[in-house]
């Protein structure tokens, strides 16, 4: 079924898993546009309360009877094939559409759609670009994969031709998007439960770049060899960024303050544009900022608005998020779940004025832990001590493929101070016995490891 965002406003649309970050944003866009929306999720949440207050009919729990007088059912890749609502829709011959295709259909209703892709950094880059476009009063519609204070959550409904969204490569989802501007932040090994290897991943990003029209733009990280190759092969306009001089946009004269935030000069094709100080820490965030600046230049946003937007951007929740301080111990939470991200997070922490860094890491999915096992043994060197939790299964089942105990043994064999724990309370009790004033407690992972830090602050 095709879906016309402009014309099909008489349709009732049901979302299976409406409380998810992306699905809730899509539902909000439709509600604001006058559609009748229903949905279901396995638990209540603040996001669901917000949708209810906007007029959505939401059920807690997935049941066949929830599919009632529905014209279209939208679902995500995380929904199993035996989901009762999915089965009911099929039996009733109700049109089905997966989340990525549906998002792509909505994007077609916006002239200037921007799709931010890459293995790492999508949420932060989208957050930065959101702040910049808001500073310039472009009134964008925004879908971001995290909670952003500036827009009061994970979505913003605009009334302009500008549309900003993350574009995930998992199961080739982003190949269903029609971007006017596409960003490729980086290409790394991930989602190896779906992709065969890094070459297949890179080929998928190449296909993504070919979705951009000839008068559109591809923005890419020039220092990433695979991204650079795609920049040279695409048929649209290109704009590159990086630390090397062969990039169109570069950062020079870089300095970091005591909070790990960078100040630097932005150069375009050898010309100094302006000086900027970021409000998010880490060298990797210089690159995210440069990517967002590239898009800003494409849209002729003024330097003043770029500087204002980036200065105001404190990042999304769960992206090196300051949670609080107790007895001189700082608690920070980060979503990092890939070795490259973990390295960047710990490197950022090292730049700050802390005594010792205690890192509690919760691996995310068995397939990722197994596929990147060797890389995981090399990414925690900047932690003074690692507390390793059991693997967070997410969409997977434990088949004995790999365990946190095995990873812990490998890390200890490399000389890292590491202990394994098997519950949030065990992790909490351990760090409470070790932490002293001046230390940093860093909870890392895409699961529910954040609970440990939050409990510590309430102790």
UniProtKB/Swiss-Prot annotation:
List the InterPro entries: Mur-like_cat_sf, Mur_ligase_C, Mur_ligase_C_dom_sf, Mur_ligase_cen, Mur_ligase_N, MurCDEF_pg_biosynth, UDP-N-AcMur_Ala_ligase_MurC
Name the pathway it acts in: Cell wall biogenesis; peptidoglycan biosynthesis
Quote any Pfam family the record assigns: Mur_ligase_M
Recall the GO molecular function terms of this protein's record.
Answer: ATP binding; UDP-N-acetylmuramate-L-alanine ligase activity
The EC number on file is 6.3.2.8
Where does this polypeptide localize?
Answer: Cytoplasm
User: Binding of ATP: at which residues?
Assistant: 118-124
Q: Which GO terms describe its biological process?
A: cell division; cell wall organization; peptidoglycan biosynthetic process; regulation of cell shape
In UniProt terms, what function does this protein have? Cell wall formation.
Entries under NCBIfam families matching the protein? murC
Family listed = Belongs to the MurCDEF family.
| Protein name from the UniProt record | UDP-N-acetylmuramate--L-alanine ligase
């Amino acid at each position: 079924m095709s879906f016309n965002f402009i014309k099909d406003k008489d349709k009732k649309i049901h979302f299976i898993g409406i409380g998810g970050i992306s699905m809730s944003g899509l539902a909000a866009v439709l509600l604001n546009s006058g559609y009748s929306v229903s949905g279901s999720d396995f638990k209540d949440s603040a996001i669901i309360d917000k949708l209810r207050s906007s007029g959505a009919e939401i059920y807690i729990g997935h049941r066949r009877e929830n599919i009632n007088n529905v014209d279209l059912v939208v679902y995500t890749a995380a929904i199993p094939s035996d989901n009762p609502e999915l089965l009911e829709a099929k039996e009733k011959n109700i049109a089905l559409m997966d989340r990525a295709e549906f998002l792509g259909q909505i994007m077609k209703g916006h002239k200037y759609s921007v799709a931010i892709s890459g293995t790492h950094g999508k949420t932060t880059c989208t957050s930065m670009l959101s702040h910049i476009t808001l500073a310039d009063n472009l009134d964008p519609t925004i879908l971001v994969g995290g909670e952003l204070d500036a827009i009061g959550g994970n979505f913003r409904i605009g009334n302009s031709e500008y549309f900003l969204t993350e574009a995930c490569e998992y199961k080739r989802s982003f190949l269903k998007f029609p971007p006017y501007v596409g960003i490729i932040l980086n290409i790394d090994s991930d989602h190896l439960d779906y992709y065969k290897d890094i070459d297949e991943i890179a080929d998928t990003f190449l296909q993504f770049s070919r979705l951009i029209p000839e008068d559109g733009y591809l923005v890419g990280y020039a220092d990433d060899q695979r991204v650079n190759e795609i920049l040279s092969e695409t048929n649209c306009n290109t704009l590159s960024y990086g630390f090397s001089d062969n990039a169109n946009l570069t950062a020079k004269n870089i300095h970091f303050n005591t909070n790990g935030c960078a100040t630097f000069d932005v150069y375009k094709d050898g010309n100094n544009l302006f000086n900027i100080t970021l409000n998010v820490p880490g060298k990797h965030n210089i690159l995210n900022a440069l990517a967002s600046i590239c898009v800003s230049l494409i849209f002729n946003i003024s330097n003043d608005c770029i500087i204002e937007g980036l200065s105001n951007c404190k990042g999304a929740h769960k992206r090196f998020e300051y949670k609080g301080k107790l007895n001189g111990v700082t608690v920070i939470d980060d979503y990092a779940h890939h070795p490259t991200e973990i390295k960047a997070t710990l490197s950022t922490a090292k730049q700050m004025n802390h005594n010792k860094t205690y890192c509690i890491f919760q691996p995310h999915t068995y397939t990722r832990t197994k596929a990147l096992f060797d890389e995981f043994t090399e990414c925690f060197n900047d932690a003074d001590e690692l507390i390793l939790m059991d693997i967070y299964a997410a969409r997977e089942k434990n088949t004995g493929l790999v365990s946190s105990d095995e990873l812990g043994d490998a890390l200890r064999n490399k000389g890292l101070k590491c202990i394994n724990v098997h519950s949030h309370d065990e992790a909490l009790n351990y760090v409470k016995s070790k932490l002293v004033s001046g230390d940093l407690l860093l909870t890392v992972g895409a699961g529910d490891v954040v609970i440990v830090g939050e409990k510590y602050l309430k102790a």
